């Protein structure tokens, strides 16, 4: 079931956020994600966040600010079950256009977004992580 994030679930989604980022971005020091943990948590109430709940456990979430996908994360133990696809499909049902950034080296995420109909827009350098990012967009 997909539903809005509840404040009492902030710790769970931040746990998913931290460990998914560390696992998916081995090319970025883990301390980068740890150092940005509190800042990201503070932004949760300002974002449109939807969670995928399965048997009363939050398995993943998608965070949006307007038409921008700030993040899509699924807990490792729930990957491969279509939860990421379902969360993105939900966001697509609410928006006619979506944009996101993905690290160039994150091949799994790039493949996922391309399969979901996202197209390449531009490549740019992220000073904070010292990595190239790709901007992708989707339009209905």
Role assignments for model-derived ranges:
Residues 93-105:
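Conserved GNAT acetyl-CoA-binding A-motif
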Residues 10, 15-40:
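Conserved GNAT-fold acetyl-CoA-binding loop/helix
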Residues 48-60:
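Conserved beta-hairpin
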Residues 85-86, 105-122, 126-133:
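Conserved active-site alpha-helix within GNAT-family acetyltransferase domains
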Residues 68-79, 102-103:
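A short, internal acetyl-CoA/4′-phosphopantetheine-binding micro-motif in the GNAT/acyltransferase core
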Residues 78, 82-90:
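Conserved acetyl-CoA pyrophosphate-binding loop and the N-cap/start of the following alpha-helix
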